[in-house]
Every structure is written in structure tokens, then in C-alpha cells.
Amino acid sequence: MATISVVINTLNAQRLLDDVLESVKEADEIIVCDMHSEDETIEIAKRHKCKIFYHERTGIVELARNWAMEQATCDWILVLDADEIVTPELWQYLKNYAQHPKKNRNACYIPRETYLLGKHVHSWRQSGIKRFWKRGNCYYTNEIHKMPVTREGKDFWINKNGKLKNVALIHYHIPSLNHFGVRLN
């Protein structure tokens, strides 16, 4: 049976971390790679029995993501931001895909629905964000906000036609103007 590691990089991520971790509670392994948070992030991760690792703050998350993925021990890796929730339908899809992957399709793009200031932003719906792959098959470059590079095989777009209801990541981006101001600083 194929196993799934979830990798989440955090920095002062207490706002949604309980919900994020609850959404992947069935994972075989949850790795939280923290960049020395100063809020309740670590306490929340401990309550969810995550494997906790620390990485220095580098200015971009990609370096820490690569390092965190090296700590994963399962067959497949799902990378999440600390403000992304996996729907039950997506989790079931990923578990099934890990058991029966499409031939030579070793990395998957997942649809992502974004909420900004509490409202769904329909025009920001992406056809997919590459976040699920066989362990060791993808890595991030040192460029911020770039998709990871696939080493072997081709990429697969999950639910590209949108026919599968609720098979998506839910991204709660910038919940308030106050939060937006904090992010700018």
C-alpha cells in the first residue's frame, strides 16, 4: 500500500494550522518545517503529533521546502502552504492516485480555490498547482513562487476539466486588510 507524507513549511502560522492539519489527519506522516515561529505554531503541530523540524529563515520558502521534503519517508509527498486546506474529496482522490498512478505520471497539479478577504475569487482559479508527487521526483529551484521541477516522467493535471466536485485545495489567502498590512512589513 502506497504511503503519503504531507510537508508543510511554517512561519507564525497559527491562524489556520489546526484546520490545515485536521484536513490531512489521515496522512501516514505529517512534517512541519518551521522557520522559528514566535506564535503558537509549534504547540499546534505538537497537538497533531507532527514531526517537527526547524530551518533557518532564508527569505524564500523554496530552500526550506527542499530540505523538508528530504525528511519525508513515505512513497508520495503532498506539499501544502500553512493556509491551504485539503478537501475530503481531494484527500480521497490523492489516496487512490497513490495506489494506482497513471503510467509515467509522477507529479500532479491540483486545482486550488482561493479566498481573499473571506470571499471566493473565481477569476483566480488555477488549472492547477504542482503539489503532489512521488518522493524524490520533484524539487524547487531557488526562485520564489516557481513551480517545482519534475525529475522523471510527466505531470498530470487532477480534475483539469472541473468535473470532479470539491477535488481542490482551498487557499485562505489574506483574510483581512490588517493581515495584508502585516505581510507587507
Regions found by a protein language model. Give the residues of each.
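A conserved acidic beta->alpha catalytic loop
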Residues: 23, 34-44, 57, 81
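Cell-envelope/extracellular polymer assembly enzymes that use nucleotide-activated donors
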Residues: 3-5, 29
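Conserved donor nucleotide-binding strand/loop of the catalytic core
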Residues: 42-71
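Acidic helix N-cap motif at the loop->helix transition within catalytic regions
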Residues: 15-18, 39-48, 89
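Short aromatic/hydrophobic "clamp" motif used to bind/position activated sugar donors
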Residues: 77
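Catalytic-site signature of metal-activated, phosphate-bearing donor transferases
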Residues: 63, 69, 87-185
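Short, well-formed alpha-helical segments that are part of the catalytic scaffolds
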Residues: 7-26
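Short, structured coil segments at secondary-structure junctions
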Residues: 26, 48-49, 128
